[in-house]
């Protein structure tokens, strides 16, 4: 199994995401933002958290125009798997791979803490290691994590069972308490919380491990 983790100027969670993939059995390649192609045979692309390009213009807006993002979009359009975490989620919305946008937190402050997430669906490669309704503890660290989409889009996400996670106690004002969403084919997940920071007992918890193990098991059997 092969994973590629994209690195932008300002990324700061790329190594954490790579380690989480490696611990689940993936062979991981780090891919620079100026590269125009993903490594051959990549099963899943990780778009990590951080502050790509200093969050200028809008979070993820400049990164979405980078050469590697064209390859990431093409990978997703071919049915490839992708995981966008925090800034990675912002980037995936900016590229149009996922609907909606991430706005400034309702409280206008940066938030860094562990929050409770409710697993909204177990019907995806990313969430099949959980049961719908499970509550897991996962860190957040963002200033612009307030998910927004219009009413029709939110209803579509609900009707298609594409809301992956919701906040138990909404920290940032996200519409419908949404913390993470799936693409139409359910092979792309964008989420503001950091599952890679909940993958080591020594770092505060392991509730994110099931996600990476589930991906590993699915792609091994594929």
Curated annotation (Swiss-Prot):
CC annotations in GO: cytoplasm
InterPro entries from the UniProt entry: Class_I_gatase-like, PRibForGlyAmidine_synth_PurQ
Active site positions, chain numbering: 86 (nucleophile), 194, 196
Domain (Glutamine amidotransferase type-1) ranges: 3-222
Official protein name in the record: Phosphoribosylformylglycinamidine synthase subunit PurQ
Enzyme Commission number(s): 6.3.5.3, 3.5.1.2
Top-level taxon: Bacteria
Catalytic activity: N(2)-formyl-N(1)-(5-phospho-beta-D-ribosyl)glycinamide + L-glutamine + ATP + H2O = 2-formamido-N(1)-(5-O-phospho-beta-D-ribosyl)acetamidine + L-glutamate + ADP + phosphate + H(+); L-glutamine + H2O = L-glutamate + NH4(+)
Keyword Cytoplasm: yes
One of the GO biological process terms: 'de novo' IMP biosynthetic process
Pfam families registered for this protein in UniProt: GATase_5
Quaternary structure and partners: Part of the FGAM synthase complex composed of 1 PurL, 1 PurQ and 2 PurS subunits.
HAMAP family xrefs: PurQ (MF_00421)
Pathway where this protein functions: Purine metabolism; IMP biosynthesis via de novo pathway; 5-amino-1-(5-phospho-D-ribosyl)imidazole from N(2)-formyl-N(1)-(5-phospho-D-ribosyl)glycinamide: step 1/2
Source organism of this protein record: Ruegeria sp. (strain TM1040)
Taxonomic lineage from the root: Bacteria, Pseudomonadati, Pseudomonadota, Alphaproteobacteria, Rhodobacterales
Compartment(s) where it occurs, according to its Swiss-Prot or TrEMBL record: Cytoplasm
GO molecular function, one term: glutaminase activity
SMART domains: GATase_5
Annotated keywords: ATP-binding, Cytoplasm, Glutamine amidotransferase, Hydrolase, Ligase, Nucleotide-binding, Purine biosynthesis
Primary subcellular site in the record, as a coarse category: cytoplasm
Gene3D superfamilies: 3.40.50.880
